């Protein structure tokens, strides 16, 4: 079969949770002998428009230039997706699978009605847009509402035209029910996201791993990796740690990732007297990320809003690390299955503080690292889950090339 997968970006270019799942699916299908085309934006503007790589035929379109609040940028992404497909893919595909709304809508306008169409909803588009303004004032929020409404209409249209709809958590399906109605939600098949267990090894000696990373030894090291934007809850984590420090507990926090909130977070860490206990590591590659998960005493996931799966929690558990998290979105589905007490009572700084103090005091239930990894492998192994997604996309009667 000839399959087109529409993604926000090509994961090796710009790693993210949704791009990872789209990439893994594409590589899996190509490994079965299918002809797989992956179309995505090129955020850097430096990649070739057409390239064959990883067994895939990659189509990348250049950055879309428009003002942030300009609603025309939505149609520009769709137009560019359609253009690169028309330019390079001369034969009609058999199947179209979307992992990103605008790119899927662009491809759907080209092939809809003639091919099998499937959509995986990683996060409802209007909520994703509005979540970017968590904690912001009304001056920033108000211009987003017309854009969010436009995305909502487009998403509903794409869902209606999809023969198969999947989501990566029960939480996401519940959001679909609230936003688009029960008649749409009942069509959504929940297939959990996954991690590549082979990429994440159980550490032999966490202290030695910290030393190799230049992290302090002899003190509990908390680790998180996030895009540094308000909805990720890092401001709340810093305020929680201020309370942990005031309570006399020792710790060191490493924050990997980058984003527009970084300067404000660094200033806040200074204002709270945390500079000696908090390290901003910046962007890290996947090899370094695996070593960081494995070296940490615990992984912290302080999400403030809209966590529709939580891939990084699964990756951390694949190294045997406990995950201390807020009960936001789908996180309880991922973390609660191994230990409900690893979840804070809510996503407030006080609740996060209390959870961290309990961990540092050794009063939370403990699990052997081997058991934590076994849980992650049983529930979220790429080997099984990507095959489930591919089956849903291709359909029960779809021929294998």
Predicted regions and their residues:
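Short hydrophobic beta-strand element within catalytic cores of glycosyltransferases
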Residues: 313, 322-325
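Acidic donor-binding loop of glycosyltransferase active sites
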Residues: 163, 294-308, 321
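Conserved acidic donor-binding segment of nucleotide-sugar-dependent glycosyltransferases
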Residues: 337-350, 357-364
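Carbohydrate-associated surface elements
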Residues: 171, 194
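Short alpha-helical donor nucleotide-sugar binding micro-motif in glycosyltransferases
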Residues: 283-284, 291-296
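Acceptor-binding helix/loop patch of EC 2.4 sugar-transfer enzymes
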Residues: 67-68, 115-156, 175, 198
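Short His-centered aromatic/hydrophobic patch
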Residues: 98-103, 121
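Conserved donor-binding/catalytic core segment of Leloir-type glycosyltransferases
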Residues: 166, 216-232, 238-241
């Amino acid at each position: 079969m000839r399959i087109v997968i529409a993604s926000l970006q090509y994961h090796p270019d710009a790693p993210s949770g949704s791009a990872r799942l789209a990439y893994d699916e594409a590589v899996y299908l190509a490994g079965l002998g299918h002809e797989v085309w992956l179309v995505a934006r090129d955020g850097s503007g430096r990649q070739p428009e057409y390239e064959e790589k990883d067994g895939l035929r990659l189509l990348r379109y250049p950055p879309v230039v428009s003002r942030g609040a300009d609603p025309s940028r939505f149609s520009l992404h769709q137009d560019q997706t359609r253009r690169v497909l028309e330019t390079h893919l001369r034969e009609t595909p058999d199947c179209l699978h979307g992992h990103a709304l605008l790119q899927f809508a662009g491809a759907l306008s080209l092939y809809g009605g003639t091919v099998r169409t499937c959509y995986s909803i990683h996060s409802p588009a209007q909520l994703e847009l509005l979540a970017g303004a968590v904690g912001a004032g009304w001056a920033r929020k108000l211009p987003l509402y017309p854009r969010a409404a436009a995305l909502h209409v487009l998403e509903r249209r794409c869902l209606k035209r999809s023969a198969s709809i999947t989501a990566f958590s029960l939480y996401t399906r519940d959001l679909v029910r609230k936003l688009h109605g029960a008649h749409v939600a009942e069509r959504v098949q929940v297939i959990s996201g996954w991690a590549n267990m082979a990429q994440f090894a159980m550490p032999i000696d966490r202290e030695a791993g910290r030393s190799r990373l230049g992290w302090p030894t002899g003190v509990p090291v908390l680790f998180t990796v996030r895009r540094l934007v308000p909805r990720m809850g890092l401001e709340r984590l810093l305020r929680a740690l201020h309370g942990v420090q005031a309570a006399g507990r020792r710790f060191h926090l490493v924050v990997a990732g980058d984003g527009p909130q970084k300067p404000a977070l660094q200033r806040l860490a200074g204002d709270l007297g945390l500079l000696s206990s908090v390290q901003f590591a910046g962007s890290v590659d996947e090899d370094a990320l695996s070593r960081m998960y494995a070296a940490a005493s615990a992984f912290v996931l302080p999400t403030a809003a809209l966590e529709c799966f939580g891939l990084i929690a699964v990756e951390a558990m694949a190294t045997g690390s406990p995950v201390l998290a807020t009960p936001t979105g789908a996180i309880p589905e991922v973390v609660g299955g191994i230990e409900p007490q690893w979840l804070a009572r809510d996503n407030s700084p006080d609740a996060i503080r209390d959870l961290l103090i309990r961990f540092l005091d050794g009063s939370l239930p403990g699990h052997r690292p081997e058991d934590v990894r076994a849980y992650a492998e049983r529930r979220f192994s790429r080997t099984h889950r990507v095959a489930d997604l591919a089956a849903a996309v291709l359909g029960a009667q779809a021929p294998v090339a």
